[in-house]
């Protein structure tokens, strides 16, 4: 029996030529802008892309010309396929906004007996999990795939996943006095109007911070404070807050450890925004300590976690 696991994520430019494609596809996603009229959404996406293209390209250039998400995901896939090498199970991936898209990946497995879709987002949101699954399901329909389809949903409450987070946090401050450091969980912000329509993202993120905080306390790890802040605001609408820049500007300790709680794989928002852009704010405020914890990425712990989740269903 041929079984396939497709890891789903947002994607990111693999080179500077893909920056425009990434922006255009992201802003043309009906789950992002919330505009149902395709023509209006397309025009607005084009305008936003043109306005942001130069600065986004400059940001990617600082990252070496590409987002890290592609290379890390491919490494993760390779490690998973090696781990399951003796079983009739194949791992692959699909991105929402850059190649390989869902239809590109799924066409390779049109005759698989079973396909497991695994969105790599710990919290539920229409802008992430729903959008990725919608793209995959549209591809499945277009390709007339008759395979048995299974889905792994959000997993922020999973203790195995959260132990990866707490372990990476503890490792980062192993030689530090954590009681003098403020731990800030940074989450990708969303417009409040999306939350007001019933999106679970804010609730799940708040609950996740509480779960991790309790686990750290149980392990005897004490921080000066633990808080949640948001990043990546865009445009004049009202967004979830507080903004990370405001939190950093008002931080009296001048010592901050940042954990990107929205992401399983590092990308431009972690490697550029958190590690470069917000670090500049910390430098301007003369911080004594500012560090960003890496996402689970292609670590052996995350490989083992994905294997555990997959074995539950296949």
UniProtKB/Swiss-Prot annotation:
Pathway: Porphyrin-containing compound metabolism; protoheme biosynthesis; protoheme from protoporphyrin-IX: step 1/1
Gene Ontology cellular component list: cytoplasm
GO process terms (BP): heme biosynthetic process
Keywords: Cytoplasm, Heme biosynthesis, Iron, Lyase, Metal-binding, Porphyrin biosynthesis
Highest taxon in the source lineage: Bacteria
Class in the EC hierarchy, top level: lyase
HAMAP family per record: Ferrochelatase
The family this protein is said to belong to: Belongs to the ferrochelatase family.
Name the record gives this protein: Ferrochelatase
Gene source species: Campylobacter fetus subsp. fetus (strain 82-40)
């Amino acid at each position: 029996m041929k079984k396939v696991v497709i890891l789903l994520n947002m994607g990111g430019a693999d080179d500077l030529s893909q920056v425009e494609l990434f922006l255009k596809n992201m802003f043309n996603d009906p789950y992002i802008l919330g505009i149902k009229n395709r023509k209006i959404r397309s025009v607005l996406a084009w305008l936003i892309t043109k306005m942001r293209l130069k600065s986004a390209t400059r940001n990617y250039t600082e990252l070496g010309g590409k987002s890290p998400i592609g290379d890390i995901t491919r490494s993760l896939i390779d490690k998973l396929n090696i781990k399951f090498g003796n079983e009739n199970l194949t791992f692959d991936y699909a991105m929402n906004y850059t190649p390989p898209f869902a239809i590109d990946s799924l066409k390779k497995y049109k005759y698989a007996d079973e396909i497991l879709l695994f969105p790599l987002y710990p919290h539920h949101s229409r802008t992430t999990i729903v959008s990725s699954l919608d793209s995959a399901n549209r591809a499945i329909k277009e390709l007339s795939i008759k395979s048995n389809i299974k889905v792994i949903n959000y997993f922020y409450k999973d203790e195995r996943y959260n132990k990866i987070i707490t372990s990476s946090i503890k490792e980062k401050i192993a030689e530090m006095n954590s009681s003098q450091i403020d731990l800030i969980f940074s989450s990708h912000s969303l417009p409040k109007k999306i939350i007001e329509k019933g999106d679970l993202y804010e609730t799940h993120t708040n609950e996740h911070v509480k779960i991790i905080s309790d686990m750290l306390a149980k392990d005897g790890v004490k921080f000066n404070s633990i808080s949640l802040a948001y990043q990546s605001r865009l445009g004049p609408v009202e967004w979830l807050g507080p903004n990370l820049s405001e939190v950093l500007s008002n931080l009296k300790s001048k010592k901050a450890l940042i954990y990107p709680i929205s992401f399983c794989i590092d990308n431009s928002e972690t490697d550029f925004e958190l590690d470069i852009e917000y670090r500049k704010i910390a430098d301007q405020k003369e911080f004594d300590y500012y560090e960003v914890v890496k996402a689970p990425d292609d670590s052996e712990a995350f490989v083992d976690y994905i294997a555990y989740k997959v074995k539950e269903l296949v």
